[in-house]
């Protein structure tokens, strides 16, 4: 903004690299083996130069420990420079095995593999060029303080197709197992098992019946498994002096999302059956399905009483023009 002096700058750079190797072995026990690996880096940086103006003094609490603290004072007018520095850096690798074979009239395709992915951020997160001008409630949370999330998965899938009289039947069954590794999380057994089954019966070139069933287990989000550090600030004392100046004492209390040792993983069950008809270049599909979610995640509040001191000036006390204030953090 040329008039106010405000401006915003954004930098967004993406780097991707990947490699893929395939071995076409065509042996009696293997058809091919494929290896993939990739690196993804997203450098995203935003800079906001913002003007602030207040009619009265504004407190700003930035304490990171529990206790009583005097709030900083923000100027009546000032420019603040907010930086959000994100540097997402992800790694991935996979090994895939495939075996195609034929037993008389039965065609079989077996796929199996292992996948690994690591996701994280090496950026500094949100910060201010001048920390004393950070707004009330701000605390630095560098992205580097959060651990990488590693996902390892194993999967297998078998597809069969064979004639049944003058019709063709296709069957597919698969299972996927995943495990998360997050350093420092309190949750154990971060693994899921997701089976599935599909079938398609091609009665003739115009009519087919199909159906499927599967279960998908879903883990909670990263910030549930590794909660963010949050803060609660409660004003316990405030006073004015020198006619236009004010000071405030706050009780600050760090907290995080509570660990639920009885938390069970959300499970989605899906089933469907359908009829596909092709007539005169027109495709008609009739599908019936059933979806059910067990143990859905939801946030709940629990209340734990705690105490803190609220102070008041004695009756008749007059605050001096330039008071010396000492705060006992405990």
Which residue stretches match the model-derived regions?
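Short, flexible coil/linker segments at or flanking structured domains
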Residues: 3-7, 79-83, 140-144, 187, ...
């Amino acid at each position: 903004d040329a008039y106010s002096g405000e401006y915003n700058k954004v930098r967004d750079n993406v780097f991707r690299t990947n490699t893929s190797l395939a071995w076409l072995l065509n042996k009696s026990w293997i058809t091919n083996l494929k290896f993939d690996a990739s690196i993804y880096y997203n450098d995203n940086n935003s800079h906001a130069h913002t003007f602030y103006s207040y009619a009265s003094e504004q407190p700003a609490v930035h304490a990171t420990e529990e206790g009583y603290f005097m709030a900083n004072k923000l100027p009546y007018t000032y420019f603040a420079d907010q930086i959000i520095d994100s540097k997402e850096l992800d790694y991935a690798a996979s090994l895939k095995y495939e075996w195609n074979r034929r037993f008389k009239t039965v065609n079989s395709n077996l796929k199996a593999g292992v996948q690994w992915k690591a996701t994280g951020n090496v950026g500094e997160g949100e910060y201010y060029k001048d920390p004393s001008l950070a707004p009330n409630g701000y605390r630095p949370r560098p992205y580097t303080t959060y651990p990488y999330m590693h996902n390892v998965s194993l999967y297998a899938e078998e597809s069969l197709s064979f004639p049944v009289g003058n019709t063709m039947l296709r069957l597919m069954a698969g299972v996927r197992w995943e495990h998360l590794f997050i350093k420092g999380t309190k949750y154990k057994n971060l693994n899921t098992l997701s089976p599935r089954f599909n079938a398609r019966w091609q009665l003739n070139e115009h009519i087919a019946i199909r159906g499927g069933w599967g279960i998908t287990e879903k883990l909670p989000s990263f910030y549930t498994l590794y909660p963010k550090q949050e803060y609660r600030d409660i004003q316990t004392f405030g006073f004015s002096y020198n006619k236009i100046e004010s000071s405030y004492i706050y009780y600050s209390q760090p907290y995080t999302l509570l660990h639920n040792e009885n938390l069970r993983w959300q499970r989605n069950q899906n089933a469907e059956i359908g009829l596909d008809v092709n007539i005169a270049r027109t495709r008609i599909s009739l599908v019936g399905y059933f979806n059910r979610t067990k143990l859905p995640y939801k946030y709940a509040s629990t209340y734990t009483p705690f105490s803190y001191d609220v102070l008041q000036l004695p009756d008749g006390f007059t605050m001096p023009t330039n008071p010396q204030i000492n705060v006992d953090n405990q």
